[in-house]
Amino acid sequence: MRAIWTGAITFGLVNVPVKVYSATEDHDVPLQPLHAADGGRIRYQRRCEIDGKVIPYEDIARAYDDGERMVVLTPEDLASLPAERSREIDVVEFVPDEQLDPLTFDRSYYLEPDSRSVKAYALLRTTLEDGCRTAIVTVALRQKTRLGALRVRGNLLVLQTLLWHDEIRAAAFPSLETVPPITERELALSSALMESFAGDFQPETFADEYQEELRKLIAAKIEQGESVDVAETFGEGAAPAGGGAVIDLMEALQRSVERSGGKAASAFPAAEKAPAGKNAATASAKKARKLA
């Protein structure tokens, strides 16, 4: 990996030099736009809509349009702004881990200590881990000041840039203002179904099926040419059960629990042990008939 930024974590008088690396990368298959008729590459040009000319980068300005007025900002205007070039990851405060909302997470970066700062790096990492704390920081990346979270991941410190508060949209849905009551039986069935799918998250067991199928299609076309048999290459998947029909929630839960077996099958009888009201009398009568 190649470092994209070098600087130092600072809090109080402590200074921990680090290198910053992107923690993620895109593995999507790159596809180029072509002219279907002759295979020519599609080129996008910066063409002015008024005079029709192709405009070089040095002649391109930026503008803000509020719907009524347009303010043009030249490269010189933008260059006059106080660009943030600080090389510090400045710790603002230490907060409990659970206070961070994953919705605010943006990009992730690995931090590697400088050869002279390994002990200070390890001390900060251990202090955060033992205290179940996350460091809230500000950092200048690509000339923009970003809010970030310094977190522990294994034996590493990870910088997670955060969205600003006003970048998180508020959610208010009328459909959730009045929620129908949930019965004990519905909750029991839903819990049993959830338990049947319970497990430990292992991300390596999941794969991007679309990208895998796309690579398979590309390989088939390389080998067989344009006459590739798509049905033979991918097989024909069975139509999804149910055909999109709307069914009752209880019926859907019941069928799902019965189909899942395993944990749900063993948990389901327990959900039937304490039916309420009229259901209790019905259940008792059924048991009496069975014993007779």
Swiss-Prot record:
With LigD forms a non-homologous end joining (NHEJ) DNA repair enzyme, which repairs dsDNA breaks with reduced fidelity. Binds linear dsDNA with 5'- and 3'- overhangs but not closed circular dsDNA nor ssDNA. Recruits and stimulates the ligase activity of LigD. CDD domains: KU_like. Keywords: DNA damage, DNA recombination, DNA repair, DNA-binding. Residues 264-285 have a biased composition (Low complexity). This is Non-homologous end joining protein Ku. Residues 9-187 form the Ku domain. The lineage of its organism: Bacteria, Bacillati, Actinomycetota, Actinomycetes, Micrococcales. Pfam families: Ku. GO terms for molecular function: double-stranded DNA binding. Residues 264-292 are annotated as: Disordered. Homodimer. Interacts with LigD. InterPro entries: Ku70/Ku80_beta-barrel_dom, Prok_Ku, SPOC-like_C_dom_sf. Belongs to the prokaryotic Ku family. One of its GO terms (biological process) is double-strand break repair via nonhomologous end joining.
